[in-house]
Amino acid sequence: MEYKKLFEPENIGKCKIKNRIIMAPMGNINMADPIGRPSLKMIEYFGERAKGGTGLLITGLIPVSYGIDPTVSEDNDTTYFPRIDGSSRTRLSGWRDLTAKVHSFDSKIFIQLTAGLGRVGSPEPALKGKILKSASINKNFYVPQLPHFPFTDRQIKKIVKSFGQSAVNAKVCGFDGVQLHGHEGYLMDQLTSNPWNRRRFGRYSNKFQFAVDVVREIKKRCGEDFPIIYRVDLTQALKESYGDEIFRKRFKGMERTIEEGLEFCKVLYNAGVDAFDVDKGCYDNWFFPHPPAYFEDIPYVKEIAGTLKEYFKKEGIKAKVIAVGKLGKPEVAEDVLDKGYADFVMLGRPLLSDPYWPQKVSEGREKEINHCIGDQEGCIQSFILGGHPCCTVNPYTGFEDCKKVEKASVKKKVAIIGGGPGGCEAAKTAFLRGHEVTLFEKDNMLGGQLIAGSKIKIKHDVERYIKNLNYQMNLLKEKGLDIRYNCEVKKEDLIGKYDVIICANGLSPFVPQIDGMDKIRHIEAREFLKSDMSLPKDVKKVTVIGGGVVGCELAYSLSYEKNVDVTVVEMLPNLMTGVVHSNRSMLLWLMMGLGSPTGKKEDVLKNPIKAYTSSKVIKFEENKVYINANRKRKDPYTPWHTLVPENIHNPFDKKLNPNDVEEIIIDTDYVIFSTGGKASDTLYYELLKEKAAKEIYAIGDAKTPGRAWEAITSANEVARFI
């Protein structure tokens, strides 16, 4: 397929960009030193995407409100964000190095500036005695019991001035333009939107005024030709997400409608904005601005970017429109441009999983793209838990400064047992380093546990990743990598024959033994998925034991694809504990019957999933599951609310009395156990005991059951070391 539109040059203002591919603002957090100066890690991270052929890169979040919004800084005035505000020459030196690196590859780079976090900032400052701030009195997103109080007009004007100073600093450092983050419910969105700005007096009771003042201040300081992109939600889509209920529970003001969003963009264009990165949603429905694997491709690009583009054409507005939202398939991105929905496409996660996406597409090597799987564990969850952006399927993302594939000084014979994502990463990396590698896989396809997960419709991103993974590994096989399919290995096959053995043979499912299991039909979740979710014909009601992400994905898919009644039972206080907010909230939203993967109302569940948390299965009888459920268990369905990371103390989160339970009987025809697994480490310990090779390693689930992220990361570390 030809990609004429993708690789056409285009302008934003007077800034000419070599193609229509823009890197979304992902990165930065914890990629700077404690005073906010960009580190080598950040420079190499963006440099790699420039090398890969991206036309325009946009940095991640850079707040300008230090000393005003307490959520953007930490103790002793340190920060996990980079900084460009004020007049520090020390900070500016790092930014100059970054722009020089990007420009070396004929890419452009804009800096993303934001007013701050406001109500979506960490509650920790309040727990240390500081006063949290927002546009009006608003609840903290993480701990709703904590209030944010309104900024004064004077404080807001100070933020406006800081935008101007930060932008001119960026211009001096070589940035080609600025992007303003007025989306997702961050402070700039709070000051310009009805749900959060309910000011009745003063300059900023006008919802558009703050954004207009910021744009004019930047143009005044940097000149009219210095281009500005405004990142905007055409609507917060809260009513679309939850109906009227959320307004009673969380907000006092109504959302921005699409009609108001169009008017807002017109006002911003007249103020001087050159392009709009247009999206929908906010933190309270984070699955829209950060769409997980569960959404189909471009679920709302036509509705949002296409609507704005059509409006601009009608009004004679010359600003460019940038489309965003699951555009990782090259043919989909080209189609969006070809149909005129947008002037540019913005890629975030696709460029984290494969920085060379543009180059591969331009050279007709689409099958070699390392596709994003939409789990968002590396790109988002990592920095929420204190790390920096990285990627599940690309172990070099965020580590470009320190992880290199270097030729081994001594060639070794390497055996790898298991062709899951970890085993494949180990095989690929060791082979590229010059080792003689044999990969043993017991099935006829590579992919491991991900293959079972890809059997359900909402995991089509994983299916695409596995398809390309097998293609890429077969290319290496043609070059000499020995891959042996349908080959189950015993210790006798390995002892004394290899210099290095890497056990990547996964896990064994765990099914708890519960009284009465012989009285009810049951199966383990992974076995059920491998059977293509084949249910006995008489089954109308299914109970899933285990409300982790696998259990909830399976429960939803049973109702969505098989139209059966499903109940989930989970021992912990919440469903999907530890899962990134956007993915968790979307799956809850789907399970509640409030939305669909296609975005179409007709695809919403007819039978929403019933769920019991803080509940334990005590016995089975024929067609019945008996559980003890805590009487004060939480409502399992609050997708607009995230779970506070366990390292942040929440004084309002009270523990339940484990003895305060009621017995509930669930009618069911079939039980599926989604209760995790245990490491398949028998072979590993046998090999160690026999001293089967000089070097023996266990990686991924064969060491500790976990996510694909841990498996691929540990595989890469070992393979670069041997």
Placement of each model-derived feature along the sequence:
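Flavin-dependent oxidoreductase catalytic cores
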Residues: M1-I417, P421, E425-V437, P509-F510, ...
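Residue-level detector of alpha-helix initiation sites
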Residues: G177, L327, G420-G422, M445, ...
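Internal hydrophobic alpha-helix adjacent to the cofactor/substrate pocket in enzyme cavities
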Residues: D354, K360, Y556, Y560-K562, ...
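Hydrophobic Val/Ile/Leu positions in short beta-strands of Rossmann-like dinucleotide-binding domains
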Residues: I416, L439, V544-I545, V568
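Rossmann-like NAD(P)H-binding beta-loop-alpha module
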Residues: G419-L432, D538-V564
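Glycine-rich FAD pyrophosphate-binding loop
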Residues: H435-I451, D565-M576
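A Rossmann-like FAD-binding core segment of flavoenzymes
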Residues: R464-F510, M517-K540, Y560-E686
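A conserved FAD-binding loop/helix module that cradles the flavin
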Residues: L554, V579-V580, I699-I722
